[in-house]
UniProtKB/Swiss-Prot annotation:
NCBIfam families: thiE. This is Thiamine-phosphate synthase. 4-amino-2-methyl-5-(diphosphooxymethyl)pyrimidine binds at residues 38-42, 70, 109, 139. Mg(2+) binds at residues 71, 90. One of its GO terms (molecular function) is thiamine-phosphate diphosphorylase activity. Its EC number is 2.5.1.3. GO terms for biological process: thiamine biosynthetic process; thiamine diphosphate biosynthetic process. Its cofactor is Mg(2+). Gene3D superfamilies: Aldolase class I. It comes from the Bacteria. Pathway: Cofactor biosynthesis; thiamine diphosphate biosynthesis; thiamine phosphate from 4-amino-2-methyl-5-diphosphomethylpyrimidine and 4-methyl-5-(2-phosphoethyl)-thiazole: step 1/1. The gene is thiE.
C-alpha cells in the first residue's frame, strides 16, 4: 500500500439522516482538496449504509481519493473500498490484514497508548490513530493523547500517524509539527459554513508545514 496517500485532511463522515446532504458535503470536502474519507455511520440501517458507501465509492473515485470504511470489513469488500479503520473492539488486526490482503489500507485506533500503536504496526496497520488530542464532542470520554506520541511514533514506527479529536484549524498546526500525517476531522469540517473552503484551509496547513 502506498503510504504517501496517507497525508493531509482525513474527513470522517458525520451522522446525517439525509443521504443526499451527506454526499453533497463530502463532495465539497473533496473539491477543497481532501483526499482521504472515512465512512462512519452509527445511525443508518444496513441497506442505507450499503447505498451510501457505494455512492461514496463512486464519488471518491471521481476525485482520485481514498475511501475507508469504519469497523466493517464486509462492507468495505462489498463496495471495493480502499481499506478499513478498526477500533480496539472491532476485530483482530492480524486477521483483518489477512482478509484485506497486502494492498488495502488498514488503520487502527490506539487512543493514547503507544504500546497499542507498536502492536498495531506489527500486525500490519498502515496508520495508527491517537486521540482524542483535544476535547471532542464526538467522543467526550476519549483519553488525552499528547503530541509526544506523534514525535515518538514518527521516530520509531513505520506506520503513518493520524490525530483525531477536537481538531480545528486553530489548534491543528502543533499536531502537524509533531509529526501527524493525517488530521481526522468531523465537526470542524462538516459544520463549517463553507466546507470546500474549510477543507482547502486544512490542506494548506500541510503544504505550508512541508514547504
Amino acid at each position: 500500500m502506498a503510504t504517501n496517500k496517507l497525508r493531509g485532511l482525513y474527513a470522517i463522515t458525520p451522522d446525517r439522516a439525509d443521504g443526499a446532504r451527506l454526499l453533497a458535503d463530502v463532495e465539497a470536502a473533496l473539491a477543497g482538496g481532501c483526499r482521504v474519507v472515512q465512512y462512519r455511520d452509527k445511525l443508518s440501517t444496513m441497506p442505507e449504509q450499503v447505498a451510501r458507501a457505494q455512492a461514496l465509492r463512486e464519488l471518491t473515485r471521481r476525485f482520485a481519493a481514498t475511501l475507508l470504511i469504519n469497523d466493517d470489513l464486509a462492507l468495505a469488500a462489498l463496495v471495493q473500498a480502499d481499506g478499513v479503520h478498526l477500533g480496539k473492539d472491532d476485530g483482530n488486526l492480524v486477521v483483518a490484514r489477512a482478509i484485506l490482503g497486502p494492498d488495502k489500507i488498514l488503520g487502527a485506533s490506539c487512543y493514547a497508548d503507544f504500546a497499542a500503536a507498536e502492536a498495531a504496526s506489527r500486525a500490519g496497520a498502515d496508520y495508527v490513530a491517537f486521540g482524542a488530542v483535544y476535547p471532542s464532542p464526538t467522543k467526550p470520554q476519549a483519553a488525552n493523547a499528547t503530541t509526544e506520541l506523534f514525535v515518538r511514533a514518527k521516530a520509531e514506527l513505520p506506520a503513518a500517524t493520524c490525530a483525531i479529536g477536537g481538531i480545528t484549524l486553530d489548534n491543528a498546526p502543533p499536531l502537524i509539527v509533531a509529526g501527524a500525517d493525517l488530521l481526522a476531522v468531523i465537526t470542524d469540517l462538516f459544520s463549517a459554513p463553507d466546507i470546500m473552503a474549510r477543507a482547502a484551509a486544512y490542506q494548506r496547513l500541510f503544504e505550508e508545514a512541508h514547504s
